[in-house]
Design a protein with these regions (language model features):
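Short His-Asn-centered micro-motif
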Residues: 7, 52-55, 146-149
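Acidic catalytic patch
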Residues: 82-120
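Short, well-structured N-terminal submotif of metal-dependent ribonuclease cores
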Residues: 1-52, 63-75
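Acidic, PIN/NYN-like endoribonuclease modules and their adjacent C-terminal/linker elements
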Residues: 1-4, 118, 122, 130-167
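Helix-adjacent hinge/juxtasegments
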Residues: 70-87
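Alpha-helix capping/helix-boundary segments
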Residues: 11, 56, 129, 151-152
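Alpha-helix termini
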Residues: 23-24, 34-35, 39-45, 87-90, ...
Length: 167
């Protein structure tokens, strides 16, 4: 089964070293630049396809635009990731694969779902990432959400482990 890695804002900001966003996740499982880089390289070697959701693009650019760091360098590095995704340059999936999620019918469905999940504190960005995860799961991919957000990680589909037959 082919695997996709859906990259969330929290992890992307750590990977880009956005000032103030150098780590993410709970204190007992802190996600650092070293852990992110190691995971990215490991998944590249496995042939995993990386997914850049629209919410991740919008949220990450906002953190970069409001950072106290070198916005020019951060912007250039992030722009290259966006271009690689748009061009489907390995390991990135083509951004256009997600375009059906943003048609009028699916946007209305997202709005209906979100107005219920917002009561529990789910942001619209996370709700849209959940839809990206569902999209790739329905296509038969093994999907991992690479995030420091335990709430979002909870939406990751479980992978069935084959059981040994008894003799």
């Amino acid at each position: 089964m082919r695997k996709v890695l859906v990259i969330d804002t929290s992890v992307l900001c750590v990977w880009l070293k956005v000032p103030g966003k150098e780590t993410c996740g709970p204190s007992n499982a802190l996600v650092t630049y070293e852990k992110v880089s190691e995971k990215i390289e490991e998944e590249k070697k496995k042939g995993t396809t990386f997914i850049l959701p629209l919410a991740t693009i919008i949220e990450t650019e906002n953190h970069i635009a409001h950072s106290s760091g070198d916005r020019m360098s951060l912007g250039e590095e992030f722009a290259q990731i966006m271009i690689d995704s748009a061009d489907e340059k390995s390991p990135w999936a083509a951004f256009t694969e997600q375009s059906s999620l943003w048609n009028p019918e699916n946007l209305k469905k997202l709005a209906e779902k979100w107005k219920i999940t917002v009561i529990g504190g789910q942001a619209l960005g996370d709700a849209s990432i959940v839809e990206v995860v569902k999209y790739y799961t329905d296509l038969g991919y093994e999907v991992e959400i690479f995030t420091g957000d335990e709430g979002l990680k909870a939406y990751e589909p479980t992978v069935e482990i084959p059981r040994r037959r008894r003799k």
